């Protein structure tokens, strides 16, 4: 079993009482990265495959100081040695995490860079340049009236961690929207919980923040079935639609509770 959730005080993605909106936790700098050798290799393999078939690197108004600060930070702080590389993208290709950089200028904020090979149902080329408010608009129940304040907190404080989860029926980490998803089949159920660990790191002197996105799968033996069923049962229709479970929630809950 992955040790992803074995750290003290780490919230379990669906056991701690929320269904859609994730909780933020401030973490010490030594917990920014988590390295598991077998999972690391799987991520690198799937990232390489994704780069052959989809747009993964995007950029808009990324200033050179912020780019260089992030590149140096990754080379110096990553838990295993990375080969020095002149470009930020070449550094990220050696990591299990995907990377997004958000920039802040006065009251204006925007996604300035993305190197995202394993997205969760979104296209980097459609999100580049957008405000934080626009990036998260589809999430039901989220209040982004003070989105610029949230970006400022990310840039000047932290690092912060949160987990986002979804139920999937494919044994893969890449859920780019161009790849068809397998629907739930009650006669041949194969169920996973995909967990995205998001960590933010601020670069106040360069007016930006770094998002580290790391994908993991919990298999059927690792899923807490009663807790997952309870979380799904609590969702309203908007939340079920957002999670992609609107058409199978009842059957899925029944399967979780009866097997």
Feature-to-residue mapping (PLM):
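Extended, well-ordered protein cores
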Residues: 1-259
């Amino acid at each position: 079993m992955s040790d992803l959730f074995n750290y003290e005080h780490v919230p379990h993605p669906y056991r701690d009482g929320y269904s859609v909106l994730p909780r933020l936790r401030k973490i010490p700098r030594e917990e920014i990265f988590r390295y598991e050798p077998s999972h690391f290799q799987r991520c690198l393999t799937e990232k390489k495959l994704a780069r052959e078939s989809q747009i993964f690197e995007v950029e808009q108004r990324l200033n050179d100081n912020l780019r260089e600060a992030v590149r140096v930070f990754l080379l110096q702080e990553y838990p295993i040695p990375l080969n020095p590389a002149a470009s930020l993208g070449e550094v990220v290709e050696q990591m299990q995490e995907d990377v997004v950089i958000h920039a802040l200028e006065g009251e204006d904020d925007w996604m300035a860079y993305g190197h995202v090979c394993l997205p969760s149902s979104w296209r980097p080329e459609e999100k580049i340049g957008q405000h934080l408010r626009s990036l998260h608009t589809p999430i039901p129940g989220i209040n982004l009236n003070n989105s610029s304040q949230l970006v400022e907190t990310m840039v000047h404080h932290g690092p912060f961690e949160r987990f986002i989860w979804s139920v999937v029926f494919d044994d893969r980490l890449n859920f780019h929207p161009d790849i068809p998803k397998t629907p739930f089949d009650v006669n041949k159920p194969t169920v996973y919980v995909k967990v995205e660990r998001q960590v933010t790191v601020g670069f106040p002197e360069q007016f930006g923040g770094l998002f580290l996105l790391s994908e993991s799968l919990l298999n059927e033996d690792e899923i807490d079935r009663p807790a997952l069923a309870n979380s799904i049962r609590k969702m309203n229709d908007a939340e079920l639609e957002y999670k992609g479970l609107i058409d199978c929630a009842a059957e899925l809950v029944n399967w979780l509770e009866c097997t």
